[in-house]
Every structure is written in C-alpha cells, then in structure tokens.
Amino acid sequence: MRQLKGKPKKETSKDKKERKQAMQEARQQITTVVLPTLAVVVALIVVFVYVATRPNTIE
C-alpha cells in the first residue's frame, strides 16, 4: 500500500532500536563532554571571584 504524502510512516522495530541507540549515545556524551566543560566554567568563575575580592595587602 502506498504512503500518502505528509503522513508519517509507522516506526519499525529497527527504527526504534536505532533511536534508542542514538539516545544512549547522547546520554554518554552528556557525561563525557557537558559535565567536565561545566566544571571548568564553574572553576573559572570561582577563581575570578576569588581574585577580584581578595584583600590587597600593601606594606
């Protein structure tokens, strides 16, 4: 039976498996890329605030 234009085709088990695998890879990228990058950004902000607010000791 022909598919009509604009109507989405029914998802096969192969399509579902590929979609699940893609989601799993996306979750792995979150832990390997996003979290370390976020940690570096937070560390830079903390260092900047520390340097900007430390008392200057002039003798």
From Swiss-Prot:
Which GO cellular component term is one of those annotated? Answer: membrane
Q: Does the keyword Membrane apply?
A: yes
Q: Where in the cell is it found?
A: Membrane
Region: Disordered, residue numbers:
1-23
Q: Any transmembrane segments, and where?
A: 32-52
Composition-biased stretches, type Basic and acidic residues, lie in: 9-22
Spell out the coiled coil positions from the record. 9-31
Q: Main localisation, per the record?
A: membrane
The UniProt keywords, alphabetically, are: Coiled coil, Membrane, Transmembrane, Transmembrane helix
State the membrane topology. Answer: Single-pass membrane protein
Secretion signal: which residues?
none
Q: Which family does it belong to?
A: Belongs to the SMCO4 family.
Protein name as catalogued: Single-pass membrane and coiled-coil domain-containing protein 4
Question: Which taxonomic lineage is given here?
Answer: Eukaryota, Metazoa, Chordata, Craniata, Vertebrata
Gene that produces this protein: smco4
